[in-house]
Amino acid sequence: MKINRLFIVACSILTASAFADECVIEVGVADNMNFVPATLEISKTSCPSVTVNLTHSGGLQKSIMGHNWVLSTTADSQAVANAGWGAGLDNQYLPPGDARVIASTDVIGGGESTSVTFDTAGLTAGGDYTFFCSFVGHYAIMKGAFVVTE
C-alpha cells in the first residue's frame, strides 16, 4: 500500500515537472540573424503561462547587432516592426504601450540573455502568430511561427 502511494506521488511530481518544462522555451540568437528554433509551439491547456528565455551567443554589442523576441499576430507583425524603428533602442525598438505586442523581451547583445513570461489565455488555438526581432532591419529575415494548440 505504501509503495503504491509513493508511486502515485512520484508520478504526479514527474507529470507536473514535464508540464512545467514545456512551458519554458529556450530560444537562441547570434550575430547571423536567425532564431533557433525557428518555430515554437505551446499548448494553452498545459501552459496557462509561458516563459521565453532568449540567449544571444554572438559577440557584437546590442547597439550594433542587438536582438529581441517579440510576439504579435502575423497580421500585425510587419506594422509593429516598422513602428518600432522610430521608437529607438531606448524603447527596445517597440512603440511604448503598443497593444499589438503580445509579449516582448529587451534587446540584448552578444553574451547576454533575457526572458519574458506571459499568459496564454488571450491566445487562440490555431491562431496566426509570429515572433520576430524588432531591431532595425532584422524583421525581413528574423521571424518565426508561434503555434498555439488547445
Label every model-predicted segment.
Residues 1-7:
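Bacterial N-terminal signal peptides that target proteins for export
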Residues 8-15:
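Bacterial N-terminal signal peptides
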Residues 16-20:
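Sec/Tat signal peptide C-region and signal peptidase I cleavage site
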Residues 21-30, 75-94, 136-150:
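Extracytoplasmic/periplasmic copper-protein system
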Residues 21-49:
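N-terminal edge beta-strand
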Residues 61, 103-150:
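Extracellular/periplasmic metallocenter environments
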Residues 68-72:
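Beta-strand signatures of extracellular beta-sandwich domains
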Residues 75-124:
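Extracytoplasmic beta-sandwich strand-turn segments characteristic of Greek-key/jelly-roll folds
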